[in-house]
């Protein structure tokens, strides 16, 4: 039994609040335990220079943590004049993950910007951001089609992400901050709706981990992602 009382294969309580923002095409607040992230999707009629004139769209992402999202105040990166390496890594992960489930030709010469702002951090902010970003992106595409800006749906798959790790010798699903900070292995799995993998990140914090341990984490992650897909469908089909 984990410190939180969860079983090794148990996700934290999850909720998705749809459309908290009124000025974007799509938005949601995802809550996974005490990790809360605001995700929004905004459509612009410009694309990066390398795509101009190609009648193809783009999806990119920005990620940030509010100063009060952790126990000690985080300095705003804007005030420091540059983004940290972790921020850049996470927003690139979110962006390329979203592009994997989009037919960019069907988007036309438009860019969708995903914004992920961490309101409260208790582990798994990047995976929560990806899972919530899909919901925001889905709502944005729905809005663009309703307005007849898009004629066909460019979304080709669901997407969700979840963390796994080896903690005190045991494979566990969806690590909170205390588990993550003391885990022997920390990994993140990004899945498409059919169960195929989009990205895997895995790091041994103390000593190398075995293939058997990796397979065990993969199985846990796949089951966790299936639960996330089910929740996404429930909230989106109910609107």
Swiss-Prot record:
Q: Which InterPro entries match?
A: ExoRNase_PH_dom1, ExoRNase_PH_dom2, ExoRNase_PH_dom2_sf, PNPase/RNase_PH_dom_sf, Ribosomal_Su5_D2-typ_SF, RNase_PH, RNase_PH_bac-type, RNase_PH_CS
Where does this protein hold phosphate? 86, 124-126
Tell me which EC number(s) this protein carries: 2.7.7.56
Q: Which UniProt keywords apply?
A: Nucleotidyltransferase, RNA-binding, rRNA processing, Transferase, tRNA processing, tRNA-binding
The highest taxon in the source lineage is Bacteria
Coiled coil: is it a keyword of this entry? no
Reaction(s) this enzyme catalyzes, per UniProt: tRNA(n+1) + phosphate = tRNA(n) + a ribonucleoside 5'-diphosphate
Q: Which Pfam families match?
A: RNase_PH, RNase_PH_C
Q: Which family does the record claim for this protein? A: Belongs to the RNase PH family.
Q: Which HAMAP family match?
A: RNase_PH (MF_00564)
Name it: Ribonuclease PH
């Amino acid at each position: 039994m984990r410190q939180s009382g969860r079983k090794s294969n148990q996700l934290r309580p999850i909720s998705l609040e749809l459309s908290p923002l009124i000025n974007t095409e799509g938005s949601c607040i995802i809550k996974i335990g005490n990790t809360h992230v605001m995700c929004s999707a905004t459509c612009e009629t410009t694309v990066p220079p390398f795509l101009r004139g190609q009648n193809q769209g783009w999806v990119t992402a920005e990620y940030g943590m509010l100063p009060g999202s952790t126990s000690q105040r985080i300095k705003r990166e804007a005030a420091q004049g540059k983004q940290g390496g972790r921020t850049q890594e996470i927003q690139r992960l979110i962006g390329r993950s979203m592009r994997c489930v989009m037919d960019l030709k069907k988007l036309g010469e438009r860019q969708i910007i995903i914004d992920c702002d961490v309101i409260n951090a208790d582990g798994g902010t990047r995976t929560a951001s990806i899972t919530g970003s899909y919901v925001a992106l889905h709502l944005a595409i729905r809005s663009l089609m309703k307005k007849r800006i898009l004629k066909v749906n460019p979304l080709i798959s669901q997407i969700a992400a979840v963390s796994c790790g080896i903690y005190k010798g045991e494979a566990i699903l969806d690590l909170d901050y205390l588990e993550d900070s003391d885990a022997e292995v920390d990994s993140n799995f990004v899945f498409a709706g059919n169960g195929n993998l989009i990205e895997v990140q895995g790091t041994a914090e103390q000593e190398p981990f075995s293939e058997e341990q990796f397979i065990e984490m993969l199985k846990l992650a796949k089951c966790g992602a299936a639960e996330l897909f089910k929740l996404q469908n429930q909230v989106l089909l109910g609107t």
